[in-house]
Amino acid sequence: MALTKADIAEHLFTQLGMSKREAKDMVEAFFEEIRQALERGEQVKISGFGNFDLREKNQRPGRNPKTGEDIPISARRVVTFRPGQKLKARVENVEPNE
């Protein structure tokens, strides 16, 4: 099962006593800040969690899997995530399906 933005908003509602609307708006605002920073080309560092970085990928040769035709894969910018040490340590110590 995946954790969704709606799940996070529900946790804020139940644990912090926010209204559902406030909780939803806070979650949306949080992710919008991350989106905007990445659009500006900035790195996003969340202490104890990890870093979101932008990486430039060069054009490279590719192949259409159906036809086998050679096609170029265009250059693009991609978002990468590198988990921090604290997150890695916590995930390593969790049993599957906990």
Swiss-Prot record:
One CC-aspect GO term: cytosol
Gene3D superfamilies: IHF-like DNA-binding proteins
GO MF, one annotated term: DNA binding
Listed GO biological process terms: DNA recombination; positive regulation of metabolic process; regulation of DNA-templated transcription; regulation of translation
Keyword set, alphabetical order: DNA recombination, DNA-binding, Transcription, Transcription regulation, Translation regulation
CDD domains according to UniProt: IHF_A
Keyword DNA-binding annotated: yes
One of the Pfam families matching this protein, by short name: Bac_DNA_binding
Source organism, top-level taxon: Bacteria
Subunit relationships: Heterodimer of an alpha and a beta chain.
Family statement drawn from the similarity comment of this UniProt entry: Belongs to the bacterial histone-like protein family.
Function: This protein is one of the two subunits of integration host factor, a specific DNA-binding protein that functions in genetic recombination as well as in transcriptional and translational control.
Record-given protein name: Integration host factor subunit alpha
Native source species: Aeromonas hydrophila subsp. hydrophila (strain ATCC 7966 / DSM 30187 / BCRC 13018 / CCUG 14551 / JCM 1027 / KCTC 2358 / NCIMB 9240 / NCTC 8049)
Gene (UniProt): ihfA
